[in-house]
Amino acid sequence: MPHRCAAQVVAGYRSTVSLVLVEHPRPEIAQITLNRPERMNSMAFDVMVPLKEALAQVSYDNSVRVVVLTGAGRGFSPGADHKSAGVVPHVENLTRPTYALRSMELLDDVILMLRRLHQPVIAAVNGPAIGGGLCLALAADIRVASSSAYFRAAGINNGLTASELGLSYLLPRAIGSSRAFEIMLTGRDVSAEEAERIGLVSRQVPDEQLLDACYAIAARMAGFSRPGIELTKRTLWSGLDAASLEAHMQAEGLGQLFVRLLTANFEEAVAARAEQRAPVFTDDT
């Protein structure tokens, strides 16, 4: 699938090849591409380190309103690379148990950064999303799949657990507990068609339409209030963690009051409807 004009490239950790690309295909949209197509964009540390760096940079790029995350070539990501895991930084002189802890911490950080990113993240799942690749997709705010994509919680097939990188937390919240139990305990493939039906993805589209579909969603979100979008993302995620409806409603109310009282966005929306034009939100008084 072709990628658009590259405005910035984040170099790979070990290789001279750029294993993570940051591009700007449309105004206010950043596209982050896992660029290791010969390994289906597997999650080697040589990819995860620059991905973490790219996310940190994009989060504070005020020209970016929405992020699209995808993979180069035929795959989104098949998860761990068991043949070429890459190099974990800052592990000199550590014992194997501590080395393992640092490795898992790095992968966990990537998942959490997607959730904490200031901008909404759309996962453009262009092929297999397996194991850790499924976790990456679930950490995004919105998922759109190409027709050739499929999903698998692969740990159970490898004699391990299927629980990794937040999967046992994220998947039940996305599709319900019974379906999550069945998918994680059987390790079976979930097609793009089924993923759309059960709510694992928002929609599936023909392969050649995937990026344009994601850009269209991103462009719509980019037209709204920046703090409105950011606070809505925050409250959606905090709602998944909320201990009670009452506590969450208070957090929602404070966010709504913040934007209502500190900006003229609502007045602009009312005026725009009366004048039959698109609103222009300044996020200011």
UniProtKB/Swiss-Prot annotation:
Molecular-function annotations in GO: enoyl-CoA hydratase activity
Record bears the keyword Lipid metabolism: yes
One Pfam family of this chain: ECH_1
Enzyme class: lyase
GO terms for biological process, alphabetical: fatty acid beta-oxidation
Catalytic activity: a (3S)-3-hydroxyacyl-CoA = a (2E)-enoyl-CoA + H2O; a 4-saturated-(3S)-3-hydroxyacyl-CoA = a (3E)-enoyl-CoA + H2O
PROSITE patterns listed in its UniProt record: ENOYL_COA_HYDRATASE
PANTHER family: ENOYL-COA HYDRATASE (PTHR43802), IP11341P-RELATED (PTHR43802:SF1)
Listed name of the protein: Probable enoyl-CoA hydratase EchA12
Species this chain originates from: Mycobacterium tuberculosis (strain ATCC 25618 / H37Rv)
UniProt lineage: Bacteria, Bacillati, Actinomycetota, Actinomycetes, Mycobacteriales
Gene coding for it: echA12
